Curated annotation (Swiss-Prot):
Pfam families attached to this UniProt entry: PapC_C, PapC_N, Usher
Keywords associated with the record: Cell outer membrane, Disulfide bond, Fimbrium biogenesis, Membrane, Signal, Transmembrane, Transmembrane beta strand, Transport
Bridged cysteine pairs (disulfide): 813-827
GO MF annotations, alphabetized: fimbrial usher porin activity
Protein name: Outer membrane usher protein MrkC
PROSITE patterns for this protein: FIMBRIAL_USHER (PS01151)
GO biological process: pilus assembly
Family: Belongs to the fimbrial export usher family.
Broad class of where this protein is predominantly found: membrane
Signal peptide: 1-18
Compartments (UniProt record): Cell outer membrane
Gene: mrkC
GO CC, alphabetical: cell outer membrane
Gene3D superfamilies the UniProt entry points to: 2.60.40.2070, 2.60.40.3110, 3.10.20.410, Outer membrane usher protein FimD, plug domain (2.60.40.2610)
Amino acid sequence: MKQRSICPGRLSTAIAVALCCFPPFSSGQESPGTIYQFNDGFIVGSREKVDPSRFSTSAISEGVYSLDVYTNGEWKGRYDLKITAGKDGKMGVCYTKAMLMQYGISPEKLNPQLSEKEGFCGRLQEWRHEDNVKDTLIQSSLRLDIAVPQIYEDQRLKNFVSPQFWDKGVAALNLGWMANAWNSHISSANGSDNSSAYLGVNAGLSWDGWLLKHIGNLNWQQQQGKAHWNSNQTYLQRPIPQINSIVSGGQIFTNGEFFDTIGLRGVNLATDDNMFPDGMRSYAPEIRDVAQSNALATVRQGSNIIYQTTVPPGPFTLQDVYPSGYGSDLEVSVKEGDGSVEVFSVPYASVAQLLRPGMTRYALSAGKVDDSSLRNKPMLYQGTWQHGLNNLFTGYTGVTGFDDYQAFLLGTGMNTGIGALSFDVTHTRLKSDTLDEHGQSYRATFNRMFTETQTSIVLAAYRYSTKGYYNLNDALYAVDQEKNYNSNYTVWRQKNGMTFTVNQNLPDGWGGFYLCGRVADYWNRSGTEKQYQFSYNNMYGRLSWSVDAQRVYTPDSSGHRRDDRVSLNFSYPLWFGENRTANLTSNTAFNNSRFASSQIGVNGSLDSENNLNYGVSTTTATGRQHDVALNGSYRTPWTTLNGSYSQGEGYRQSGVGASGTLIAHQHGVVFSPETGPTMALIEAKDAAGVMLPGSPGTRIDSNGYAILPYLRPYRINSVEIDPKGSNDDVAFGSTVAQVVPWEGSVVKVSFDTTLQNNITLRARQANGLPLPFAATIFGPSGKEIGVVGQGSMMFISDASAPKATVKWSGGQCSVELSQEKTKETLCR
């Protein structure tokens, strides 16, 4: 653990020397009251001037101690452990089989016979007679270190902490927000002004493990003349660690792993994979495209806007988009400064789902359909269940439906030598006033990582065998159309569909490529939709370059309309002195084999913490159109500000934005430029200016608080503060802490601080001899306030004390501290 001395300056050196005299105690080597004899001949100088007696006696004794337990360096929690003396008089920890399992150790592997005992007190080596099996008690930090070979660890519990150490957090409001304002002016014969504003809110009120969550946005369009609030989700949730599940009620979404993701006003109970040891994690797609100017990128899932941001000219990648569920494609729109809009979809399908043997995953949902585009909103139910049968097979099943529709699914996942496979069959029945259809759908998925060639393949294929098959979403729209005589939309029922993704890392120097695609046709529509995307990237020295290509086939009355887009991108790092870096970028785009645009620009940061960023670019487009674009962002201690401006022939665009987080807690309000669902509230009183290495640019505020985002729920998170920037008179008990938060919680991490008025003073005994090295200094109240260092230098942490007493074995003396501190004085 990284620590800062309680007395800054040279006092830290003295204390470091003193602390090194405290030995770690092996549980198999220490006995109570052990006397340690120090050879003071190793200390340079006169031996009678050294007093190591204070470090000569072990304070360890039999009893119960609250100790932090580490297995092979990994924290496993703080436990109350009984320490007792064995027959040989040596100290040992009392273990049980259950305790070792909590520490991530397999008792059966360590010693099958001894593991049957109720309990055992002694050295861990007595469980396994090997030199590399040992336990060491470090008394100075109340820590038990256990070291065992990896073969004796329970790998299922790697990086896992017992739920009893999960932190529910404090009562707090976590309000994340993002605001954008956008204006576009077109100066032509039919010129127009187009303005819009957007405020996105992701708020969570947490207390005692409960979380009241609201996700919504406020949209204002100049043409509409009024603002509209869109509530995407409002729900109350509670983790249930006893069954590794989470329950929620309100505006929720069904799990789209096997059926379509549907919004409900209802309740949901489902397994939370985050509560299990590290394994498969939820998947979120990357969204890639190229903007021709400062553009507004909007991501929709179904009828809901789930993400919106401003992107600068050139290639961009959105990696922080988190869809609901697993099975609904995303629609992305990119609105350029001149008013043009590009719309494309991003395939979003689950890969083959495999579970460990004996592991079960389930999801239960029920409620009223919540979809603003539907008039008919029936009550809907859904349930899915998966179970790991053995190392080869995982079985799964599911059911969903409403009054006029039912669907049943049965499938299996297989872990084979050629990759992860799954196959399932879904039978549906749709029976309403005018519809009576039934059919089947057969689905196969494949996932494989070829380690030899570093090739990753994800393939999801769907085949609808009969014309009467309706998926859940199609059925809802078909019934809504029937009951409301609404013909504004058509239900296209998919017949065959396939999506695939290939990632390939090539040998050194050859870069890598990414390929994805989607193919689909429909029973009630002629032609086939096809969409392919390819990206290749590489480096030549410091020059990064890539080629992106996209081809889209869209059925129309004449057959197929083909749209091609190709872009060539370059980036070269520049250097303008310390803390000032920049990248020279270039992008050239072609549409349908014709030149579309060429853009060149510079972007970078003006400080070492990337708080102040900028971008400048110029673009030449088809028809001799030219524009210039500027954008920048500034991360303050409270929020992140951004702005953009571009102007071209016949138009100009401007935009401003801000984002951040507000945490309201019992003792006040804290602001942060970062956002996140699970956060730490850092408390370090009188430590304004202290930095958080895990969040560049974030510092403790004047009230002694700061926010650290991006904590992993149910996992160990190390929280660190850097004393740099604090007052020299502030002493820290420690600068590193560990916490395991509940999902959506705000956990409080307090660092002990002490305000001190430190002084140094050289003093000698009345006989002229120096004070003994390492002698202890006490104040008038008897409290220890310092230590004697080399050269008879007194390091004192309380300058307000009028008098100090120096004690060592065999003597003591006193010093009046009110006299001149800069001169040598006598200790009488």
